[in-house]
Each structure stands twice: as structure tokens, then as C-alpha cells.
């Protein structure tokens, strides 16, 4: 196996850091300047920025519009505030400067972050969107992705349930792959992070408190993302955190208290209804009737609760001599509505942004740390609470087995029925799953302007991301779950999971930028090198209580390296015609040396129509009109945890496959499938867009059309027996297409110093279709996906050419004249008189066709009021809760136990899992805690498209306070 190795010069880094701190006392001759900032009405402008020109040193005005700042006596001050025209005023050795800001609303000179640099928003040629959390509605956002929900067209964020610290699935313009990851690349302060998280922490964005985020920049099309090459097929989200400014220290304290409760519960039969049903279906002298208890237990009430949570954020920003700094700490205590679930998180961060040598060397240093303690519940209790017999008690007085919790026992022997469902309360109380996670992420970025050529800059970025976790999963002795099948009867177990993940980064690039006024041209050329290494190791050890006798032991270690060369040219002619060309070459250790390298080009053109002479008659009304056209290719190689899919390797077998020898069981190894010719998955994107703004920029927006096609899809396919080490391998086969349009518009109807009203609307349409799936182009070939509970190996979704990914594959239900489904009767689609697999139809998809959002935010002095409406249209959900808990045959199992049914049953005698009766339109209109939908399940927003007792999202009521000093 060929390795790519590189060791960064950490000694050089230490020398640079020493130089920074030794230079803190070196200052230019400085004076203290004070003054006042007012608007054209004579009212003080509160919170206006006052910055020393050419530096990051600055302060903000107080409640009376006053400021005080220290600056070189021959420098200039820049005064700015949202909605007003910025002013640059030379100090000229003055100690008092007061200004009046004129109203402007928005400036098109706003700078947005792109890959390895920044660009003025008006000069961007790609599909780039910026979201600033401080300018959107406030709320109980405990994670960064909460702030992106509904904020920009084409970006869909679906939370994976309501548990504390729940992650979210983020999709930009649909998915570009079937088996490789569809997650966008996330870059935090210049460091691309691993989206897979770590053992004991499902959300990789947990360490970035929402209050610390300055902006999100979302790169959508290939002309914008290709600079990141191999990791950008699914778009890029650049997160920039807040930095310090000069002046006296500014202290911010945010406190939020919230109360959460379940929105509603699944409707099931109560104890009396269940007794009547058993009597009707089996008779009062039946074995089933004899199993009924005397209790009246609402199992969902027993496992759910109302909770109180809190979140506190404290930050201090300012400047010490020539060192701007910002320090923050966050403490979050979030309790889940499912009992025994909680999350306690502590984060800390520090940012230093000094400049040296007459501002030619800019240093940007960021260090973030996190400690999180998660207590996980056994989420099987959610489904158990729906189906468990409501006539049974939580505990049985005097019962020793199962620690007194009700269990299904054989009537004649008293032995535990191993296949019976478990008491849902015991799953929470008699289990313990606790994790401790430590994580640190940081970087130092040095940007140096060459003294011999000021137009040339060198940029070095050294970064790291290290996580360490430990999780203990315990089944207490004599607990009901220890009597379950494949467990040691009554013997407790402790499963200990450890994991270390390490991500190292080195980026270096040169950037040349110059205005050639004599030929009306501006040129920017950038070329660079990137190296990134991912390493992980860990272990899983299972021991038996009380003597910690080993039962299962697995250790592993893996690494992945990426090596890249990249370049970009930006050319502007007459500030009207724009061109961007990007080229990146990537190598990955995930593929063999013959397929290791991939080349990813991109080209974008822009035309500022507003700057044409023929637009001058409307220039006083229209402020921006820009046409964009982009083309590019991006790559994909991220196949989850499969680091070497081209090599024949062995992995540790499962505990159930251990081999007995003497009085012990030994782990076995199993072979992994491999393809020596696996290579890059490539996505080609075309994009055309139009940006506009008018009425002094009070109304602005954009329109985009895109076409994306992914070829050489990395797919997991079956292979003939004997042709490989397993019956399935990852290989390149197939194509996938996404096509859509996006539109957004925002308005500021009212902007004054005291009152601001923002309105925003966006809508996106996406069409997804598989265009190739196998080499033979077999029209009948499909890949079954979407496993469900119930039966053995049942699936309800499929990938097939000509249909969207994750389409539903079900029988078409036949109904009687009253609209009731007829059990076992389906449409004979091929007319052969037999209902079989050939009669199933591919119908609808889990993904929405249309996603919309409308926001309103009003801010008056120190108060704000806002709301957000968002809607998904065209998405469908298979209700597995209903299909698995609504047939009469399920209420009694001859092994000796009962199951409850949901109240909206079908009156089927036997389960009909493959009926499209259970497929529902799950479109919705949501305003935080209020949801309007036709879907009758708990929540229409299910990422997988299969509703199977996911952790319910709570209703949350929030009270918050913000204190600034």
C-alpha cells in the first residue's frame, strides 16, 4: 500500500507565535479619539462600527452614540452601520471627531468568503449565498445548523429527531450520490472538518455555539465549489466565527431558558378498548384473553416528560495594545423529553487577530474547545410505548426477575419469553448509556503582503481538529433486556467504546491582485497547495458483570490522506465583464495509485448589465442587475468509513459470529469486498443566475437555474458468488441527475435608527432522476433500499433508472365503495392474473419537490419580533408505525404475549406491509411549534421517508435575555 506522508514544520509555527507575542509592545504613535455618531434626524446611532482604516481595530458606539478609540494619529477612521453610507475620515491628530451618517440601507460592496479568499458580493460569478445569524430571527438554536433552516433557497436542513444534540441532514440542491456521502463540505474558520462526528457525539457542529457565528457562506454551484475539488460535489458551507475589535472590552451575555414537552403522542387503544378488542377477536375464554392484566397504563406518558433546559453564552472582545481578541464560553444543559436523555455541553474559544510590520503581516489565530456529556436513552422505548399491552403494570410487586419490571413469562414455567417485547420503562431505567467527548479545533493563518511587490500576498494556514471520546453502555444485572434473545440470561453487560479522531491541515497559496487602469482591467491570480490527513483509532470491548469477564473485543485504526494543487484566475473588464477560472487536482489514498488523481476544472462568466450605458436611464431606480453563467466538475470519494475499498482486507466479525473454544468464545475475521479499479465519482454542473436590486437596494434578490449530472456513481452492488470475497462491493456504476430553479427576494420596507423591518421569501424546485444504474442497461433492474420494521428483510424504496432516488416500490391498494382498503387486493398492473413482484409500482419519493420559506423580522430599539414560515411540498412518508401496529393478527402471539394497536387501524387481519395505503403525502407548512399537514403521523418531516417511531420533536417555549456592556 502506497502512502502519502508529509510533516508540517511545527517548529517554524512556534517561532512565528513567539514573534507575535514579543511584538505586542511595538506600537506606532497613537492618540485617543472620541466623538459622537448621529443620523440625519439628529438621533444617536447605537452600535455603529468605528474602525481604524486598514486594520481590524475598532469599537462600537454606546446607547448615546458615543465612542472612544485609540489609533495612530495619521490614520483614518471608518464609520459604518447597517442601512447607512459608510464614511472614512482622516484623524489628522484630532482627539474629537463626530459624524452624521446618511441612510443607504444596503451596500453592494459587502465581502463574502469563498474558497481560499474573499470577493465583493457584486463581483461574485458563482451561486454564493451569505447568511448572518445576527440578522435573522432569534430562537432556541443550540446548534449551528438550526440557523440555516429556511434561510436560503436550495438548502434543506432536516433534523434527525428531537433528542438533545441531535444532528441534522443538510442537503444543497438535492443529493449527488446514491452510496457515497451527500453531506456538504463544512469549513470552520479555514479548517475543513469531518462530518461523521465521533463516538458519543452525533453532531459535528456541536462545538460552534450559534452566538459565536459571524456568517455562513454557502457555495452551491461547481464554479464556486470546484476550488475545493474532491470534497465539494455536495456544496460547501463556510462558517466564519466572530473576531475581536479594538477599543474598550465589550462584554456580551446571552441567557436562554426553555420548557419542552411532547407535541402529541401516537393514538393507541387504551386499556378498556384493548380488552374489548381482545374479547371480540379471540373470545373471553381464549389464551389471549387470559393474558390481560388489570392495570390501565399509558406507556407513552410513562416514557415521556416535560423538561427545562438552559443555555448561557458569555463573550468578551476588545484589544490589548495591538492584539484584537475575542474570548467566549458557552454552557448548555438540554434535557430531552424522552426520560434519561440529556446533554451537558461546555465550549470555549479564543480568537486573536493582530497585524504587524505596518499591517503587512496579518495573523488570524482561532482555538476552540468542547466538552460534552451525553446521556442516551434506549430509543426502542418509543416504539415499545406504542405497542406494549396497556393492561399491564410498570412493575409487579414481589417479582424478582427483571428487577421487578413487568415481563412476559411463560404461564406454566415462569420462564422469560425471549422473543417478547420489552417493558419500555425498563429500557430506560435499567440501562445506562453515557458518553464523554473532548474536542479541540483550531488554526493559525498568516497572510503576508510582499514588501517588494504589494500586489502579491502569501497565505499559510495550519489547522487541526482532534476529538477523543469514551462511551459506556450498560445493561444492569437481572434487567429485562439481559433475558432478550442473544443475551446472557440475567447477566449484566458493559460495552466500552473508545475513539480518537485526528484531522491535520496545511494550506499554502500565493495571491496576486492588481488593477490595470490603462486597460480597464482587474486581475487576480491565485495558486496553492493543500495537504490534509485524517486518522482514527478505537476499540469496542464488552465485558460481563460483575467480574468484567471479556466477551467481545474489537480494535481498529485507519487513516486517509488528501493531497491537492489548485489555482484560480479572476478577471474583470470595465467593472462590467467578469471571468473566473478554477482548476484543482486532488489525490486520495482511498483509491489505488492508478486511479488516485482527479482533475476538476470550473469556468464562470458574469455580466454587470447595470453598468452598461443603455441602463443609465433606470440607474436611479435599479441598483444591481448581473447575469451569471457557470460550469464546473467536482469529485467525490467519501465512502463513509470504507478507507480502502480497492484492497482485499479483513474486518472483525460480530459477537454472534464468535467461535467457541473451551470455555471461551473467540472473535472471527470476515473478508471485505473490494474493487481494485474503483475511482472518482464526478459531478458536472451548469448554472445560470440573475442578481437584482432596486429602490436604493431596499428590494434585492436572485434567480438561478442549475443542471447537475453525476457519473461513475459509487454504488454498492451485488456480485456473483465466488467472484469476490463477499456478495456486495463498492464500484463505479450509474448516473444521477438533479435539475432545478431557485428564487429569493428580500425587502426592507422600513429602516430608521429605531425601527427596522426585514421581509424575505425564497423558493426552490428540484427534480431528481437516476439515468443509469448498471452496465447492461437492464430496464427491469433496481436496487431495493429503505428497510422497515415488520416481516423479514422488507424494503419499501428502490433505486431504478428513470425514477428519483429513494422512490417507493409498493403494491397499488384497491378500495371498496366506501373508500376502505380491501385486505390483500391490489391492482394487477401487468394483467397476468397473478399479484407478484412485477405488479409493484414505483411511486413518489421521500424528497420534496418544492421548498419555500417566508420570514419577517421587526426590530425596535432593544426589542425584536419575528417569525419564520417554511413549507415542503411533494415529499411522501411511509408510515411504518401504522403498517406495523394496525393488523388484528399482531395483537396475540402464540408464544404467550400481546401487542397493542394504534387507534387509526386498517381492520386488516394480517399485516400488509407492501400496500401503498401506508404511503402518505407529508407536505407541510411549519412555523416553529405550529405545523399544518395532511400527514397523520407524529411529524411529517422525516429525512429517510420512513416513519418508524423516531425520537419526537418537542414543542419548546423560550425566554431569553441579552445583556451588552
What are these regions (language model features)?
Residues 136, 183, 307-310, 345-346, ...:
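Extracellular/periplasmic, surface-exposed regions of secreted and cell-surface proteins
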Residues 50, 79, 186, 571, ...:
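Short aromatic-centered micro-motifs
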Amino acid at each position: 500500500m502506497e502512502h502519502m506522508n508529509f510533516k508540517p514544520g511545527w517548529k517554524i509555527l512556534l517561532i512565528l507565535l513567539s514573534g507575535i507575542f514579543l511584538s505586542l509592545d511595538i506600537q506606532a504613535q497613537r492618540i485617543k479619539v472620541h466623538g459622537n455618531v448621529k443620523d440625519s434626524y439628529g438621533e444617536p446611532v447605537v452600535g455603529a462600527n468605528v474602525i481604524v482604516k486598514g486594520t481590524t481595530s475598532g469599537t462600537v458606539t454606546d446607547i448615546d452614540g458615543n465612542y472612544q478609540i485609540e489609533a495612530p494619529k495619521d490614520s483614518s477612521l471608518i464609520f459604518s452601520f447597517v442601512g447607512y453610507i459608510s464614511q472614512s475620515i482622516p484623524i489628522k491628530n484630532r482627539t474629537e471627531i463626530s459624524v452624521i451618517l446618511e441612510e443607504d440601507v444596503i451596500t453592494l460592496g459587502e465581502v463574502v468568503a469563498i474558497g481560499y479568499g474573499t470577493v465583493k458580493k457584486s463581483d461574485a460569478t458563482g451561486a454564493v449565498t451569505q447568511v448572518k445569524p445576527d440578522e435573522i430571527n432569534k430562537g432556541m438554536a443550540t446548534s449551528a445548523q438550526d440557523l440555516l433552516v429556511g434561510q436560503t433557497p436550495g438548502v434543506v436542513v432536516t433534523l434527525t429527531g428531537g433528542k438533545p444534540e441531535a444532528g441534522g441532514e443538510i442537503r444543497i440542491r438535492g443529493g449527488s450520490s446514491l452510496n457515497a456521502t451527500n453531506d456538504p463540505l463544512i469549513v470552520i474558520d479555514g479548517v475543513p472538518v469531518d462530518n461523521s462526528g465521533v463516538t458519543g457525539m452525533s453532531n459535528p457542529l456541536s462545538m460552534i455555539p450559534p452566538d459565536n457565528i459571524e456568517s455562513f457562506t454557502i457555495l452551491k454551484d461547481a464554479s464556486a465549489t470546484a476550488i475545493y475539488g474532491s470534497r465539494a460535489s455536495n456544496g460547501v458551507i463556510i462558517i466564519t466565527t466572530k473576531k475581536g475589535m479594538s477599543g474598550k472590552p465589550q462584554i456580551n451575555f446571552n441567557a436562554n431558558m426553555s420548557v419542552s414537552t411532547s407535541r402529541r403522542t401516537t393514538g393507541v387503544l387504551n386499556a378498556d378498548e384493548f380488552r374489548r378488542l381482545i374479547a371480540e377477536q379471540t373470545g373471553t375464554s381464549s389464551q389471549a384473553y387470559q393474558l390481560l392484566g388489570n392495570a390501565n397504563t399509558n406507556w407513552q406518558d410513562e416514557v415521556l416528560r416535560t423538561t427545562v433546559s438552559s443555555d448561557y453564552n458569555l463573550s468578551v472582545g476588545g484589544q490589548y495594545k495591538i492584539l484584537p481578541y475575542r474570548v467566549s464560553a458557552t454552557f448548555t444543559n438540554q434535557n430531552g423529553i424522552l426520560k434519561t436523555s440529556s446533554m451537558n455541553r461546555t465550549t470555549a474559544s479564543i480568537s486573536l487577530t493582530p497585524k504587524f510590520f505596518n499591517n503587512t503581516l496579518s495573523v488570524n489565530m482561532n482555538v476552540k474547545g468542547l466538552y460534552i456529556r451525553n446521556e442516551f436513552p434506549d430509543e426502542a422505548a418509543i416504539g415499545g410505548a406504542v405497542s406494549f399491552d396497556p393492561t399491564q403494570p410498570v412493575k409487579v410487586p414481589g417479582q424478582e426477575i427483571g428487577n421487578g419490571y413487568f415481563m412476559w413469562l411463560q404461564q406454566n414455567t415462569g420462564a422469560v419469553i425471549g422473543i417478547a417485547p420489552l417493558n419500555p420503562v425498563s429500557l430506560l431505567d435499567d440501562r445506562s448509556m453515557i458518553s464523554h467527548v473532548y474536542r479541540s479545533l483550531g488554526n493559525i493563518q498568516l497572510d503576508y503582503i510582499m514588501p517588494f511587490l504589494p500586489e502579491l500576498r502569501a497565505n499559510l494556514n495550519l489547522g487541526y481538529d482532534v476529538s477523543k471520546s469514551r462511551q459506556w453502555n450498560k445493561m444492569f444485572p437481572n434487567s429485562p433486556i439481559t433475558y432478550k434473545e442473544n443475551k446472557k440470561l440475567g447477566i449484566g453487560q458493559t460495552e466500552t467504546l473508545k475513539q480518537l479522531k485526528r484531522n491535520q491541515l496545511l494550506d499554502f497559496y500565493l495571491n496576486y491582485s492588481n488593477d490595470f487602469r490603462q486597460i480597464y482591467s482587474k486581475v487576480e491570480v491565485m495558486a496553492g497547495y493543500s495537504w490534509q490527513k485524517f486518522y482514527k483509532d478505537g476499540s469496542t470491548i464488552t465485558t460481563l458483570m460483575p467480574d468484567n469477564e471479556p466477551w467481545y473485543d474489537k480494535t481498529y485504526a485507519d487513516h486517509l490522506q488528501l493531497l491537492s494543487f489548485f489555482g484560480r484566475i479572476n478577471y474583470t473588464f470595465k467593472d462590467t465583464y467578469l471571468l473566473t477560472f478554477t482548476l484543482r487536482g486532488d489525490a486520495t489514498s482511498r483509491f489505488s495509485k492508478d486511479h488516485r488523481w482527479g482533475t476538476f476544472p470550473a469556468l464562470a462568466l458574469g455580466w454587470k448589465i447595470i453598468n452598461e450605458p443603455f441602463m443609465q436611464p433606470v440607474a436611479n431606480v435599479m441598483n444591481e442587475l448581473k447575469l451569471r453563467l457557470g460550469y464546473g466538475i467536482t469529485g467525490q470519494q467519501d465512502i463513509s468509513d470504507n478507507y480502502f475499498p480497492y484492497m482485499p482486507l479483513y474486518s472483525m466479525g460480530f459477537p454472534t459470529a464468535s467461535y467457541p473454544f473451551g470455555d471461551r468464545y473467540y472473535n472471527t475475521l470476515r473478508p471485505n469486498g473490494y474493487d481494485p479499479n474503483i475511482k472518482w465519482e464526478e459531478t458536472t454542473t451548469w448554472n445560470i443566475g440573475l442578481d437584482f436590486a432596486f429602490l436604493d437596494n431596499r428590494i434585492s434578490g436572485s434567480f438561478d437555474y442549475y443542471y447537475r449530472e453525476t457519473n461513475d456513481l459509487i454504488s454498492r452492488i451485488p456480485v456473483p458468488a465466488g467472484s469476490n470475497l463477499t456478495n456486495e462491493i463498492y464500484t463505479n456504476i450509474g448516473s444521477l441527475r438533479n435539475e432545478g430553479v431557485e428564487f429569493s427576494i428580500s425587502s426592507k420596507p422600513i429602516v430608521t435608527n429605531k425601527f427596522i423591518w426585514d421581509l424575505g421569501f425564497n423558493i426552490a424546485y428540484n427534480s431528481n432522476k437516476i439515468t443509469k444504474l448498471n452496465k447492461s442497461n437492464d430496464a427491469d433492474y433496481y436496487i431495493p433500499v429503505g428497510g422497515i420494521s415488520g416481516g423479514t428483510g422488507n424494503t419499501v424504496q428502490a433505486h431504478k433508472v428513470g425514477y428519483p432516488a429513494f422512490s417507493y416500490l409498493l403494491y397499488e391498494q384497491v378500495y371498496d365503495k366506501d373508500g376502505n382498503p380491501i385486505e390483500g387486493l391490489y391492482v394487477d398492473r401487468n394483467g397476468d392474473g397473478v399479484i407478484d413482484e412485477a405488479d409493484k409500482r414505483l411511486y413518489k419519493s421521500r424528497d420534496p419537490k418544492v421548498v419555500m420559506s417566508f420570514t419577517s423580522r421587526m426590530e425596535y430599539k432593544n426589542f425584536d419580533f419575528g417569525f419564520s414560515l417554511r413549507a415542503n411540498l411533494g415529499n411522501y412518508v411511509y408510515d411504518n408505525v401504522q403498517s406495523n401496529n394496525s393488523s388484528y393478527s399482531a395483537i396475540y402471539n402464540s408464544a404467550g404475549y400481546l401487542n397493542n394497536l394504534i387507534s387509526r387501524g386498517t381492520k386488516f387481519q394480517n399485516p400488509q406491509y407492501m400496500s401503498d395505503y401506508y404511503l402518505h403525502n407529508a407536505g407541510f407548512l411549519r412555523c416553529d411549534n405550529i405545523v399544518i399537514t395532511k400527514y397523520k403521523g407524529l411529524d411529517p418531516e422525516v429525512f429517510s421517508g420512513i416513519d418508524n417511531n423516531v425520537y419526537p420533536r418537542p414543542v419548546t417555549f423560550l425566554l431569553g435575555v441579552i445583556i451588552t456592556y
